[in-house]
Each structure stands twice: as C-alpha cells, then as structure tokens.
Amino acid sequence: MATTNQLIRKGRKTIKEKSKVPALEACPQRRGVCTRVYTTTPKKPNSAMRKVCRVRLTSGYEVSSYIGGEGHNLQEHSVVLIRGGRVKDLPGVRYHTVRGALDCAGVKDRKQGRSKYGAKKPKV
C-alpha cells in the first residue's frame, strides 16, 4: 500500500487498453492494396477453405483480411476497404474486407442480410 506522500509524488499509473485492431489507428475503416489472395484452413473442429487476402494499408501496415460471402472478384493489386473484426477460427486474421466498396464487389444473388455483403435490393 502506497503512503499519501508517495501518491502525491508519483500518483497512480493508469493501465492503457491495448487495441484489438492496431493497423486501423483509431479509424473506422482503412484503404489498402491486396498483395496476395489465398485460401486457408480453419482451426481444429472446423473444416473449410476460408478466403483471405494480405493487404498493404495506407497506414503502412500489412495485415491479413477475411473476405466474407460466397464468391469474390479480388486479385493482386485490387484496392479494398478493411474494417475491424476478427475471425475466431483463423489465427492472425483480425480484419474483414468491406464488400461492395472500392474494387471489392458485393455478393451476387444475396437476398437477406444484404447490407453486410454490399448487395443491392433485387428488382421485383
């Protein structure tokens, strides 16, 4: 226990909260260029081929970003927008690509939950 005199001299040190998305640098989204587009397998109980891209951001960071939805049009040198949000079964993937923004097209034939995948309202 610190004495009153010690607290007057030094004071309590506040613990700084570590960011879960450091590459965004307190921004909601960041723009970047795909350097590699590939598939990877998830951790133990799950099985799939998850679509991931490596992105060089305008902030200078290079991060892995998950491409959600069925099918995508991304390739090397595509300009994408990324947001925070990890993928629990892919270690090291802490960002998502925003579908329907910049070079990343929205998901085709998406009827429900369209806003998350950049899909326009279908014509009746």
Curated annotation (Swiss-Prot):
GO terms for cellular component: small ribosomal subunit. It comes from the Bacteria. One of its GO terms (molecular function) is structural constituent of ribosome. Coiled coil: none annotated. The modification 3-methylthioaspartic acid is found at D89. One of its GO terms (biological process) is translation. SUPFAM superfamilies: Nucleic acid-binding proteins. InterPro entries: NA-bd_OB-fold (IPR012340), Ribosomal_uS12 (IPR006032), Ribosomal_uS12_bac (IPR005679). Keywords: Methylation, Ribonucleoprotein, Ribosomal protein, RNA-binding, rRNA-binding, tRNA-binding. Belongs to the universal ribosomal protein uS12 family. Part of the 30S ribosomal subunit. Contacts proteins S8 and S17. May interact with IF1 in the 30S initiation complex. With S4 and S5 plays an important role in translational accuracy. HAMAP family: Ribosomal_uS12_B. This is Small ribosomal subunit protein uS12. It comes from Psychrobacter arcticus (strain DSM 17307 / VKM B-2377 / 273-4).
